[in-house]
C-alpha cells in the first residue's frame, strides 16, 4: 500500500510542477485531478487491504465474510484536504502528502471497518521514523475495534501525512506482529513528564533531536527535487 500512496504523491507533485495555481479555475482543476488520483489509488489500497484482511483471517482459521473495501475519499473530502494543504503551504510536497494520505485512508478504513464488523482486535504498528503521536497510539496495544475507533463510524482517525505506520488485526486474541512491543512504547510515553499533551510534545522534541540531521537532509533533498522539477517545467514552456 505504501507504493500506491507514494505513486499518488509523485503524480500530484509532477502536476503542480507544470500547472501553477493562480486562479480559482486552476484550483478547481487541481482538486479534480487530485480526486481522480485519490480515487484510483485509493481503490487499489482498499482492495489490497481487503485481500490482506482475508488472508489473515484464513491463517487464523477464522471464518468471516469476505472483507469489503472501504469507500474512497469523496470530492468534498478531497477538496478540503487540497485546499487545507494549499493554505498551510504552497510547497507542492504538502499537497502531495495530503492526497497520499487520502489513498492510505482508504486502506486503513478497510481494515478497521471489517475488524469492527467481525469483532476483531487492531493495533497501531509503528514503521520507519515513528512520530511521537504514533508512539503514543502504539502504546495502547491490541484493542477491540468499535465505532469509537472510527471517526463518525467510518474513518480511521490516526492517519496523518508522511506516515508509514499501519493497523494490524488479529482474531480471538491470537497472533502478534514480530517486533511490536506495546509495553516498550508505553514506557517511552510514561517516562515523559507532565500531562498527556506534554508527554507527546516531549517525545516529539526528543525524536527531532535524535533525527535532526536526517530530517534536515531530507528537507534539502526535497527542496533540490522541487527546484529540478521547476527548472524542467520552465524549459518545457520556454518560447524561442
Regions from the PLM with identified roles:
Residues 1-160, 169-240:
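Domain-core detector
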